[in-house]
């Protein structure tokens, strides 16, 4: 569960920085997660190079180490976000520090660093609300299972698996993840005992 939340948070932060406010939605990067090459279990930083690279690769479709306007457009369209060409150009320019018309991994990492510094409580609440489907302030086993299943993730396909994921972050032992637990998990750097 922690790994899914971390990748989700990285991807979501990137989209929040780029997509105009009226079009902002929250999408998990589940369809890009490579189960064959998982990151080492002892990673403890939310913005680890492995996770940042995975998010970058979501947009770098041809794997050349650069995100072009076309690749950004394709990725956003796959998420149901359709942007005018002029907005796509502005998005690339916002990230393109060296002026080559593309975004490389270093520019992406710099952008993410600034996003992390400016993270707002509202963004975290919106991310939490994706999983808290009934709006009662808790992520239950059933809600987690519903989200994980709808995303087509291998992790969390069974209620038992989701229960185990909940237990990993449930600090008060009530069998659910409340917003405080979610926020602490996302903002703390101590994921080594939960991964």
From Swiss-Prot:
PROSITE patterns in alphabetical order: EF_HAND_1 (PS00018), EF_HAND_2 (PS50222)
The GO terms this record gives for MF are: calcium ion binding
Instruction: List residues binding Ca(2+) 4.
Output: 170, 172, 174, 176, 181
Q: Which GO terms describe its cellular component?
A: endomembrane system; endosome membrane
Per UniProt, the keywords (alphabetical) are: Calcium, Metal-binding, Repeat
Tell me which residues bind Ca(2+) 3.
132, 134, 136, 143
InterPro entries assigned to the protein according to its UniProt record, in alphabetical order: EF-hand-dom_pair, EF_Hand_1_Ca_BS, EF_hand_dom, EF_hand_pair_protein_CML-like
Note the superkingdom of the native organism.
Answer: Eukaryota
Quote the record's binding site residues for Ca(2+) 2. 96, 98, 100, 102, 107
Q: Which CDD domains match?
A: EFh
Return the SMART domains for the record: EFh (SM00054)
What residues does Ca(2+) 1 bind to? 60, 62, 64, 66, 71
EF-hand domain boundaries = 47-82, 83-118, 119-154, 157-192
Q: What does this protein do?
A: Potential calcium sensor.
The UniProt entry's sequence similarity note says: Belongs to the calmodulin family.
Q: What is this protein called?
A: Calmodulin-like protein 4
Q: What is the lineage of its organism?
A: Eukaryota, Viridiplantae, Streptophyta, Embryophyta, Tracheophyta
What gene does the UniProt entry assign to this protein?
CML4
